[in-house]
Amino acid sequence: MKLHELKPAPGSRRPKTRVGRGIAAGKGKTAGRGTKGQKARSKVRPGFEGGQNPLYLRLGRMRGFKNPFKIVYEVVNVGRLNELPYEGVITPDVLRSFRLVRENGAPVKILGDGDVTRPLHVQAHAFSESARQKILAAGGTVEVIS
């Protein structure tokens, strides 16, 4: 068998339908477009809704993107830590038990709003520079956990 002898399998190819070529052809007269109306007479562009403001204009554009690597911290200020009736090492679990942090498993960041009047020993996932300075100035310790 040679290349010029190849043929498609019987019944695998259908001839192209020629529309609008007389009633006897089966697709004559309206050529499968139905009767009357804009779609019967000419093309209608995709998304056209008859003059009504189309969906893609009603919804507006979505700009920018969402960073899949963004870390969203649960934040606690040092002023709130100072008020805690707790003397041990302050960890995210301790903060959850005192309901200063909501989400389980979310990383905790300590921010520097408020005053520290006693030595605090704090473990958290992140500290702001002002929080770190206030805790250390009061004689406490900061430890970054992962």
Curated annotation (Swiss-Prot):
UniProt keyword list: Ribonucleoprotein, Ribosomal protein, RNA-binding, rRNA-binding
Gene3D superfamilies registered for this protein in UniProt: 3.100.10.10
Covalent S-S links between cysteines: none
rRNA-binding found in the keyword field: yes
Skewed-composition ranges (Gly residues): 23-35
InterPro entries: Ribosomal_uL15, Ribosomal_uL15/eL18, Ribosomal_uL15/eL18_sf, Ribosomal_uL15_bac-type, Ribosomal_uL15_CS
Tree of life domain: Bacteria
PANTHER family for the chain: 50S RIBOSOMAL PROTEIN L15, LARGE RIBOSOMAL SUBUNIT PROTEIN UL15M
Protein name as catalogued: Large ribosomal subunit protein uL15
Pfam family name, one: Ribosomal_L27A
SUPFAM superfamilies: Ribosomal proteins L15p and L18e
GO biological process terms, semicolon-separated: translation
